[in-house]
């Protein structure tokens, strides 16, 4: 039930943040906290991420759930600009002192027919690390494991990719199963690395 309510929030934000520009990706942090617990945080933080190609902001996406996993609260970030996009690869870098669990942080990917799928952090395929103290993970047609939210199967990226309706990063595992927070950088959509709130692709 928690994801059903959160998915409605994500859908609303996708319609706001995509603007119909296929060449612009936006990562919009938010929190789902209907009970007012105050334990979830989602924000971009400067000087905490990996070095940027341009500028010195070096931002990272901070997601936190400072309480039990059972609490009806989630930190998330909606990826704008993906509605109707054919995706062939997903991934991100995470700082090693943060939490990487089966369910958080994760990509929630919704297809146009309403089916949605979970890409949990520990099920991504580790790559060569981008820097000391960081881990890079990927999902594509040959790497990573994807789990369906219902009685259906992930269609696979395939040779030509899969069309999506929305993508969000969700963090809803609390301090009872890990550290309760993570720093993410270089969010990967089809090879485009997003390390700040808005990125224009080539």
Per-region residue spans from a language model:
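Short carbohydrate-recognition loop motifs
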Residues: 47-74
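Extracellular beta-strand ligand-recognition surfaces/modules
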Residues: 104-107, 131-200
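Short linear interaction motifs
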Residues: 69-76, 88, 181
């Amino acid at each position: 039930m928690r994801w059903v309510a959160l998915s409605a929030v994500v859908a609303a934000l996708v319609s706001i943040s995509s603007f119909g520009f296929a060449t612009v990706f936006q990562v919009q942090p938010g929190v789902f906290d209907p009970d007012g617990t105050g334990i979830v945080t989602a924000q971009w933080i400067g000087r905490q991420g990996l070095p940027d190609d341009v500028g010195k902001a070096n931002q990272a996406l901070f997601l936190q759930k400072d309480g039990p996993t059972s609490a009806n609260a989630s930190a998330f970030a909606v990826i704008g600009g993906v509605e109707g996009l054919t995706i062939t690869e997903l991934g991100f870098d995470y700082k090693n002192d943060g939490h990487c669990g089966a369910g958080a942080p994760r990509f929630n990917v919704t297809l146009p027919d309403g089916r949605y799928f979970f890409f949990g952090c520990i099920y991504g395929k580790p790559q060569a690390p981008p820097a000391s103290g960081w881990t890079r993970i990927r999902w594509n047609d040959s790497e990573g494991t994807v789990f369906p939210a219902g009685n259906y199967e992930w269609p696979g990226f395939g040779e030509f990719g899969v069309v999506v309706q929305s993508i969000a990063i969700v963090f809803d595992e609390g301090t009872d199963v890990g550290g309760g927070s993570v720093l993410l950088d270089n969010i990967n959509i089809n090879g485009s690395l997003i390390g700040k709130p808005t990125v224009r692709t080539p």
